[in-house]
Amino acid sequence: MQPNRPIRQALLSVSDKTGIVEFAQALVQRGVKLLSTGGTAKLLADHGLAVTEVSDYTGFPEMMDGRVKTLHPKVHGGILGRRGTDDEVMSQQGIEGIDMVVVNLYPFAATVAKPNCSLEEAVENIDIGGPTMVRSAAKNHQDVAIVVNNSDFNAILAEMDQHQNSLTLETRFDLAIKAFEHTAQYDAMIANYFGQLVKPYFVAEEEDAEAKCGQFPRTLNLNFIRKQTMRYGENGHQKAAFYVEQDVKEASVSTAKQLQGKALSYNNIADTDAALECVKSFDEPACVIVKHANPCGVALGADILAAYNRAYQTDPTSAFGGIIAFNRELDAKTAQTIIDRQFVEVIIAPTVAEEAKALLKAKKNVRVLECGEWSGTQQRLDVKRVNGGLLVQEADLGMVDLADLKVVSKRQPTEQELKDLLFCWKVAKFVKSNAIVYAKDNQTIGIGAGQMSRVYSAKIAGIKAQDEGLDVAGCVMASDAFFPFRDGIDAAAKVGIQCVIHPGGSMRDQEVIDAADEHNMVMVLTGMRHFRH
C-alpha cells in the first residue's frame, strides 16, 4: 500500500474553466506550485496567481497553432516518474515531479453537434496533449492525482485538509478510474464521428454517400454511466444495474427526480419509460397506465383527474400495481383519488404540486417522480441485444397527422372519428405487437397486445372491453401493422367497430378495403408501421 502522496506541484490545463480559478487559489493557499498552459495560464495570471507556463518550464514554446504544448519529456517525465524509483534520472534530466494533473479536454462533442461543423473544424478540436497527460497521470496514480471532473474540486480540497495536503491511494485510484472513463468516452466520440464520415468523405459528390454510410459508424462505441445498482433484475435470480447517457436534454426516466418511495426496480424503470414516452405524445391533458410495458389504459380529459378516471376505467384489474404517467402537473385531488382507489408502483409527471407531495407522503412506498416539462424529442438510437451482437436503429419517432391520412373506404370519417382515429393510432404505437386498440371519445376501450395473430389481439381487445362493461359499438380500431387478410375486419365489424386505421401495404389491401366497404366502415391508411417487439 502506497502512503498518502502530498501535492506540491500541479499542472492545470482545462477547456471547461468552471471553478478553476477558485480551485487554483485554494491550491496556492495550501502551498502548491502551479504549472499551466495557454488560456488557462492567462486566466490564472489575470487573477493574480503565480503560475509558471509550461513553455517556460520546458524551454520549448507552444507551436503549430497550439497543437504542441505539453508533449515534452519534462512534462511527461514529471507525471510518469515513479517516486523512489526514478528520482535519480529525474534529477539528472532536470525533471520536476508533477503531483496533480487537472485536465479536461477540447469540447469535441459540442463542436461536431453544430449543424455546419466541417471536418477541418472537428479535427482541430481533437485533443492530443490533454488525453496524453490524463492517461499518463492515471497510469501513475500510485504517485499522481488526475482530476478530470470540475465537480471533484471541493472534495479534493477537503481531503487535502484532512491529510496534510495529501490524497490517499484510494482517492487517487478512484480519480484514475474517472480519468480512463473520460478518455475512453472521448475517443469513442471521435471514432463514432469518423466512422460515420469515412465513405461520404472519400466518395465522389455525385455518388449516393448517404446510402453507402448513413448515420451508423463502422464501429459502435457506447458510453453510459452507472446510476444505480438493483437488488435484482427482471427476475429475482438476475443481477442488474441502470446506466444512463450523459447530456440527455429531454424529459425521461433517466433524468427524472425521485421525490419519494423505494428505489426503482428494473421492471419499474422499464415500465415507467413506456408510460412516460406514451404520454409525451399527447398535447391535451392525458393519463397513461402501464403494466408489463404495455398500456392498459389511456385517455384524454379536460384535466388530468378526468383523464385518469377514464384511463383507469379501461382495465381496472390490470391497473392494480401499475405505473401511472401524466403530461401535466400532478395535483392534490388527482393524487388523493389514486391512493384512495388503487395500489400503484410509480407515478410520474412533469411536476408535482406541494399539496400532492404532502398527501403522497402517507403512502411512503409509492415511488413519485418528477421528469420536468418537455418541448420536443431528441433523435436517438435504439439498441437491442441479441446473442453475439446488437441491433441498432433510429428510435421510432414517426408520427402522423390529419394531412398524412389516406381515406380508402367509400364512407368518409366524421371530424370526431378522425380525432379518435389519431388518438387510437398514437396509443397503438406503444403497444407490443401484434397490437390492436379500440377507442372512443379519446379513451381506450380495449387493448389487445403481444399476440402472434392479429385476429387474436382484436379478440382480446373485445374481451377486455366486455369484462369491464364497456361498449365497443361505435369504437374506432387501430392496428400497428397492416391486416394480411380480411378476417380482422370481419371480426371488428361483428363487435360494432365503425372505423379502422392501419398502415396498409399488404398484398391483399384491396380485399381488406372491400371488407370495410361491405360493413360500411371507414378505413384510413397511415403509410407508417409501428411494430414494437
From Swiss-Prot:
One Gene Ontology biological process: 'de novo' IMP biosynthetic process
One function term, GO molecular function aspect: IMP cyclohydrolase activity
NCBIfam families reported in the protein's UniProt record: PRK00881.1 (NF002049), purH (TIGR00355)
UniProt keyword Ribosomal protein present: no
Alphabetized PROSITE patterns for the sequence: MGS
Reaction equation(s) it catalyzes: (6R)-10-formyltetrahydrofolate + 5-amino-1-(5-phospho-beta-D-ribosyl)imidazole-4-carboxamide = 5-formamido-1-(5-phospho-D-ribosyl)imidazole-4-carboxamide + (6S)-5,6,7,8-tetrahydrofolate; IMP + H2O = 5-formamido-1-(5-phospho-D-ribosyl)imidazole-4-carboxamide
Gene behind this protein: purH
The name this protein goes by in its record: Bifunctional purine biosynthesis protein PurH
Record remark on domains: The IMP cyclohydrolase activity resides in the N-terminal region.
Family statement: Belongs to the PurH family.
Keywords assigned by UniProt, alphabetized: Hydrolase, Multifunctional enzyme, Purine biosynthesis, Transferase
Enzyme Commission number(s) from the entry: 2.1.2.3, 3.5.4.10
InterPro entries, A to Z: AICAR_Tfase_dup_dom_sf, Cytidine_deaminase-like, MGS-like_dom, MGS-like_dom_sf, PurH-like
Gene3D superfamilies per record: 3.40.140.20, Methylglyoxal synthase-like domain
Pathway given in the UniProt record: Purine metabolism; IMP biosynthesis via de novo pathway; 5-formamido-1-(5-phospho-D-ribosyl)imidazole-4-carboxamide from 5-amino-1-(5-phospho-D-ribosyl)imidazole-4-carboxamide (10-formyl THF route): step 1/1; Purine metabolism; IMP biosynthesis via de novo pathway; IMP from 5-formamido-1-(5-phospho-D-ribosyl)imidazole-4-carboxamide: step 1/1
Gene Ontology CC entries for this record: cytosol
SUPFAM superfamilies in the cross-refs: Cytidine deaminase-like (SSF53927), Methylglyoxal synthase-like (SSF52335)
Pfam families attached to this UniProt entry: AICARFT_IMPCHas, MGS
Domain (MGS-like): residue spans on this chain: 1-148
Keyword Cell division carried by entry: no
